[in-house]
């Protein structure tokens, strides 16, 4: 799977984990050069508190377009720190 935004591959892996129709990419497969920490957080009752990244490519910024769970519930430990995408980021084979 690949996550693409603004013509750049943000993440690529054959080992994503699918949760609620979202592909979560292992952290080591994400090109962190395109990511900047956001101060945005959301809470999922069964996964835990999500932290977000802004994606920046060629001067364009997609705010809070990637998220991950740095601390998870027991049910979500399998994808702790894995990164998922939305807001126009194309995830495809």
Regions inferred by a protein language model and the residue ranges of each:
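Terminal leader/tail segments of proteins
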Residues: 1-93
